[in-house]
Structures are given as structure tokens and as C-alpha cells.
Amino acid sequence: MAIFKQLFKVILLAGISASAFASNIMLEHGYIRAMPASVPNTAAYLTLSNHGAATELVSASTPVAREAMLHTLIEEDGLVKMRHVEAFPLPEHGQLTLQGSGDHIMIMGLKAPLELGQKVPMTLSFANGETLNIELEVKSPNDAPAAQEHHHHH
């Protein structure tokens, strides 16, 4: 009888790990902004595609920093300010784009300076219970695709 319990656990765990790869959410592109070694914070910018039902990005984490928070930029009294937000909507069969001029993931309390070209692991968590493990490269803002696409707006 004990062998059936063990077999059941193995099948259950195999089912859980297989479902982790069946995500409808995919990273299209992204990067982490390179900062001087003396600066303890940076930001991640990315585009996610959702091939399923609508959900929300509710948190991010990375082992290279104390915390990662969802932030947006708002204009208040003529000044642009950063604000923490609880979630970013990811529409059904749509995209979520986080870029320098708006929504982004603020990475705070870096444990060590990040190097250009370094690959940084990050886990994104969604309101529907899904998680997405991604890797973002540290890039200079001038080399990043989003900076090139939006450079003429500044």
C-alpha cells in the first residue's frame, strides 16, 4: 500500500511541474538598466504577451536585490513622481509593456553592483496564481530596445 502512496505523490508532483511550463504568459523582451556601482537601485523594463485570460502582474522578485516593487510614474503639481502600485493589468490575448517613461519594476537594495551583460533571474507572479521565471540582461539605456524605440520622444 505504501508504494501506491509514493507513486501518487510522484504523479502529483509531475503534474504540478508540468503545469508550470504550460503558462499562457511569455516574455517578449526586456532588460535591467545599468547604473553606476554607487547606486543601490535600478529598474527592469519588459514586454509580456498573454495568450490566455486576463490577469494582473502582482509582484516580482530577484535574488540580486532586497526587493522588487511595481512602480508607475505620475505627474503631480508639475513634478514627475514614482508611486508603488499593487498590480499591472495584463489583458486577455494582449500585452503589458513596462518602459522607462511609465510603469516599471523598481529593483531596490542591490546586494552587489550589476555588470553590463549580466543575466539577472527574476520571478514574476500573477493574480491567477501563475509565476514566470525570466532572465533579463543588464544593458545601458542607450543599448536597450525600448530606449531606441522611444528616443525621439524626449
Residue ranges and their predicted role:
Residues 1-11:
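Bacterial N-terminal signal peptides that target proteins for export
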Residues 9-19:
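Bacterial N-terminal signal peptides
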Residues 24-154:
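Compact, glycine-rich, soluble single-domain proteins
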Residues 2-4, 16, 125:
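Well-ordered, non-transmembrane segments within structured domains
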